[in-house]
């Protein structure tokens, strides 16, 4: 019986939301910027997945690296 209770306590529900972040430095920095910002408002982040990468160009120069990401976080009780 105690084992069934343990399994029930381990059940979790997660939510996924999309964000877009940018950086003038690199794609890696854009991911860090996105994670830092998401961490300010979302609790229980368990993972992120980069869905898309884009580069903004102006006057024949790269001005921003952009990433679209899924943020996975646990839903609180």
Stretch-by-stretch model annotation:
Residues 2-77:
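N-terminal, polar/charged subdomain of small-to-medium soluble alpha/beta proteins
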């Amino acid at each position: 019986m105690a084992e069934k209770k343990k399994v029930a306590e381990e059940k979790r529900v997660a939510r996924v939301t999309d964000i877009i972040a940018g950086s003038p430095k690199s794609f890696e920095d854009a991911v860090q910027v996105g994670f830092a910002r998401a961490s300010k408002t979302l609790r229980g982040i368990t993972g992120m997945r980069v869905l898309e990468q884009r580069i903004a160009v102006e006057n024949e120069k790269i001005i921003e690296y952009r990433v679209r990401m899924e943020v996975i976080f646990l839903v609180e009780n």
